Each structure stands twice: as structure tokens, then as C-alpha cells.
């Protein structure tokens, strides 16, 4: 019996060795999908980059762009005088003169002060806020950005519509301490499949009469009184109108018109219980800017930007001791800008 089993096993092994395998045969295997989470731009950037999107900006409960910028790491935001004062941003303690501010990819400039007041930009129509510590990876940035230590990019909203809803309207009303009133209105309209437009505006007013404790005298005979800050009122008006054209999948055009005006009281230092002040600062700024982008192929892309900017600033101090009885200074700025790459 054992001899028979050995013979059968030997014959089976010989048959297996003699059988040929078809190496040219194609074998089909089930499809395999390999996925990995998309790395955000902050991770892929060659220089340090911080970004706040629209949802994150809502969670910050910020009123102005300057309030949101304070949440970036390594940033110094100088606030000169509360809600109506000048607000500047500085990176790596190099000063506001070395930090560029971009509004929809085009430089914001102020030749009068040399510093951009980021407090005049609202968050109502901001879609994305980013801060580059160093040079940006965007090769289509203006030449001015290459001379800056950092870049604050403010990207406004791009309209999106549903198939059966060509109009979007949003209204907000904010109020707070010290007489703060801030209504705003936002409108998006789809004209056709290629053309759309947006319009938004806001008005903000506040008396700024915040309370403070005034102390005079030494520790043995200190005098304490409750006072309120005076001549700290502020009134701002901002409007924007934008037109968008998606001429094709590889061709886009954008046009924006912006207007801003403000009137702010400038309080004096309180000296011997005297805090009277009639100083006032008025600002007006308007600009029109346009961007055009065309992709010819995967290797060739053309982009051009143009801007016209006009600004006016007036400072008044009727109580200044001058030969003409007071101070009334006005400053004007007009700028034309064109960039192509």
C-alpha cells in the first residue's frame, strides 16, 4: 500500500513540473484607489504663510480687518486712538513701512503718511485674509511686493449663484458700547452666464465717550474723579461696486470701484482736568482697479493689473496757537498704476 502511494505522488509531481505557464497572459485585478488629504496652501508654501478663510473670520467676532490681523502670529498691530484711530500692521518689528497691503492682488498705498490704515477695511465682504512672512509664492504679484518684508493680502468675495437664484442679498446691523451703530448691505446679481456684479456698503458711527478714572495728587491726598473721553467721535462710510466676467474657463476679468470717507475727532491729553479739544481729521479715498488674466496653455499665462487712486486728507485744529488763528491743512494724492506679467 505504501509503495502505491509513493508512486502516485511521484507521478503527480512530475506532471506539475512538465506543465507550462503562459507568461504572456493578461490577468485583470480589481481597481485600487489611493487617496490622501489635499495639503493646504499653508503647508505647500515655501515661506511662512497664515490664512483665515471666511468661516474662520466669522468665528473671530472681529469688526474690522485690523481686529482679525491681531490673531496672526508674529504680527504687531499698532492702534493709535481706539475705534477711530490709525491702525497699522508690522511684521518682524520692521515697521509698517516694510509691510505691504494688497487688496484683491493690487497694492494699497498712502504717500501722505507712508503707512496704510487697515482699520478702514471691513470684514463684511472679505473672503480670505492671508499674511506672508517674506515673499509670496505667487509669481503674478506686483513688483512693489518684492521690496517688502511681508504682505497682508485681503481677498474680497467672488459671487456664487444657484441655478434658480440669480440674486443674493444680505443685510447686517451691529451695535455696541459707546454709541456704536454699524449697518451694512451686500448685493450679488448674475447678469448672464458670463457676467455678474456685486455692490456693498456700510456706515459706522460711534461717539467713543468711554469712561476712565482720573487721579491727581500723592498717595496720602489723592483726588479721584470719574470722567469720559471727549472729542472721540468717528463716522465712516464705505461703498464698493465690482464687475466679474468669466469669458471662458481660461479667461477672467474683474473691475472694482471703491469709495471711503471718514470724519474723526482727535482727543487731547487730560492736563489738570482740562480735556477740551476740537481737533478733527477728515479722509476721503476712491480708486478704480482692474485685473485681466488669460491662460494660453499650461506653460503660458498672461495677467495685467491697472489702478487709479485718489485720496484727500484734511486736518483742523481751531485752537492751535498760530499767526493765522488755527490750523487747517489739506493733502492730496493721485496715483496711476499699471502692471503686466
Spans of features found by a protein language model:
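Short, acidic, small-residue-rich periplasmic hinge/interaction motif at the N-terminus
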Residues: 18-58, 66, 96, 133
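Hydrophobic, lipid-facing positions within transmembrane beta-strands of outer-membrane proteins
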Residues: 30, 87, 148-150, 167-169, ...
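Extracytoplasmic beta-strand/coil segments of soluble accessory domains associated
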Residues: 66-107
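Short sequence motifs at beta-strands and strand-loop junctions characteristic
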Residues: 83, 144, 176-179, 229-236, ...
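Outer-envelope beta-barrel architecture signal
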Residues: 99, 163-169, 174, 181, ...
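A beta-strand signature from Gram-negative outer-membrane beta-barrel systems
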Residues: 123-170
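Periplasmic-side early beta-strands and strand-to-turn transitions of outer-membrane beta-barrels
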Residues: 153, 178, 186, 190-279
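Face-selective signature of the C-terminal outer-membrane beta-barrel domain
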Residues: 244-262, 281-341
Amino acid at each position: 500500500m505504501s509503495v502505491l502511494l509513493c508512486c502516485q505522488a511521484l507521478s503527480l509531481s512530475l506532471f506539475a513540473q512538465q506543465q507550462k505557464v503562459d507568461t504572456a497572459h493578461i490577468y485583470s485585478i480589481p481597481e485600487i484607489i489611493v487617496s490622501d488629504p489635499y495639503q493646504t496652501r499653508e503647508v505647500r508654501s515655501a515661506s511662512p504663510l497664515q490664512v483665515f478663510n471666511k468661516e474662520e473670520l466669522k468665528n473671530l467676532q472681529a469688526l474690522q480687518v485690523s481686529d482679525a490681523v491681531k490673531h496672526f502670529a508674529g504680527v504687531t498691530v499698532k492702534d493709535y486712538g481706539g475705534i477711530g484711530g490709525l491702525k497699522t500692521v508690522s511684521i518682524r518689528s520692521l515697521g509698517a513701512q516694510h509691510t505691504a497691503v494688497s487688496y484683491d492682488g493690487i497694492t494699497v498705498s498712502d504717500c501722505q503718511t507712508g503707512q496704510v490704515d487697515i482699520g478702514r477695511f471691513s470684514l463684511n465682504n472679505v473672503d480670505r485674509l492671508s499674511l506672508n512672512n517674506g515673499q509670496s509664492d505667487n509669481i503674478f504679484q506686483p513688483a512693489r511686493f518684492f521690496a517688502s518684508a511681508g504682505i497682508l493680502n485681503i481677498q474680497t468675495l467672488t459671487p456664487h449663484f444657484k441655478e434658480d437664484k440669480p440674486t443674493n442679498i444680505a443685510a447686517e446691523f451691529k451695535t455696541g458700547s459707546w454709541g456704536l451703530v454699524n449697518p451694512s448691505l451686500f448685493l450679488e446679481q448674475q447678469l448672464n452666464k458670463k457676467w455678474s456684479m456685486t455692490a456693498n456698503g456700510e456706515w459706522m458711527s460711534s461717539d467713543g465717550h468711554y469712561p476712565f478714572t482720573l487721579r491727581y495728587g500723592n498717595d496720602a491726598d489723592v483726588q479721584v474723579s470719574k470722567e469720559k473721553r471727549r472729542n472721540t467721535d468717528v463716522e465712516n462710510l464705505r461703498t464698493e461696486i465690482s464687475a466679474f466676467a468669466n469669458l471662458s474657463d481660461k479667461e477672467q476679468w474683474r473691475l472694482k470701484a471703491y469709495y471711503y470717507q471718514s470724519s474723526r475727532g482727535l482727543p487731547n491729553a487730560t492736563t489738570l482736568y482740562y480735556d477740551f479739544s476740537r481737533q478733527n481729521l477728515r479722509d476721503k479715498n476712491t480708486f478704480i482697479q482692474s485685473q485681466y488674466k488669460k491662460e494660453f496653455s499650461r506653460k503660458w499665462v498672461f495677467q495685467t493689473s491697472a489702478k487709479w487712486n485718489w485720496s484727500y486728507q484734511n486736518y483742523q485744529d481751531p485752537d492751535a496757537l498760530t499767526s493765522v488763528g488755527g490750523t487747517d491743512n489739506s493733502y492730496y494724492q493721485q496715483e496711476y498704476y499699471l502692471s503686466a506679467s
